[in-house]
Amino acid sequence: MKKDIHPDYRPVVFLDTTTGYKFLSGSTKSTKETVEFEGETYPLIRVEISSDSHPFYTGRQKFTQADGRVDRFNKKYGLKDANAAQ
């Protein structure tokens, strides 16, 4: 490998600004902020959305398309739901 061409990959702490959740990960992103985390000092990266606050990971996701293909077919042709009748 060539020297001095690779980015500086190091452990950094990511802070979810929405929830205050912190987690340690590796990154090449540079920052001037630092934070104390688990007894060590690490660079701090602030993020607006992480797995702690994103609706997909928290289970608070709203689905915009609630009807499936079968439901649309039944509505189009005026058929009743076979499962609801039982």
Curated annotation (Swiss-Prot):
InterPro entries: Ribosomal_bL28/bL31-like_sf (IPR034704), Ribosomal_bL31 (IPR002150), Ribosomal_bL31_B (IPR027493), Ribosomal_bL31_sf (IPR042105). GO terms for cellular component: ribonucleoprotein complex; ribosome. The keyword tRNA processing does not apply. One of its GO terms (molecular function) is structural constituent of ribosome. Keywords: Ribonucleoprotein, Ribosomal protein. GO terms for biological process: translation. NCBIfam families: L31 (TIGR00105), PRK01678.1 (NF002462). Part of the 50S ribosomal subunit. PANTHER family: 50S RIBOSOMAL PROTEIN L31, CHLOROPLASTIC (PTHR33280), LARGE RIBOSOMAL SUBUNIT PROTEIN BL31C (PTHR33280:SF1). HAMAP family: Ribosomal_bL31_2. Belongs to the bacterial ribosomal protein bL31 family. Type B subfamily. This is Large ribosomal subunit protein bL31B. It comes from Streptococcus agalactiae serotype V (strain ATCC BAA-611 / 2603 V/R).
